């Protein structure tokens, strides 16, 4: 039999399909993190939900939980970043959108203007199909089910043939010393090449990513032109960006 708190967790997960640990901590502010994990373990043992790193999902939910969690993290901030990034767009140009969740939000809110859009995000390409004017190219390659991104040698060879005016790149971590970082070598290679190919590169960095470090660096500050964020920029990073000639939005 479930206790009252576990019943509320069950109802929350069934309603939202996915619950992050952070959301459950907000839902139960007086309950310890250890207790929340024990509740999730108990609910999983009863077949109510399935745990994953950072949260739990409904047994009926078939989507990728890690992608859902990333979409919900700092969602309001990502919309602010996407809006700022869109202010840089010029019609009749060629742009690259990597498979980041911020770029998915950008795609959902993109105006119907003449653009040549190249993307490594299948879900981004599908979202852009609602528009009539952009020409959309989805890069070929292997699909990573966790982040819904295509990558690999075929992706790189295709990107190498593309001419890109402006690249919009998401990050998983950002610091003065390490630069802009991500979680996999495959993503690093795609992001790095897109920045090299682009005339102008725009890195979209949530304020929660500053001073976070991921395994792979795909660019340093002098390699990019803009850093777009929604919150306060650490003084050390601001100073380094100004020294490198990088514009902060």
Segments predicted by a language model, with ranges:
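N-terminal active-site wall of soluble small-molecule enzyme domains
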Residues: 105
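Pre-recognition alpha-helix immediately N-terminal to the DNA-recognition helix
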Residues: 7-11
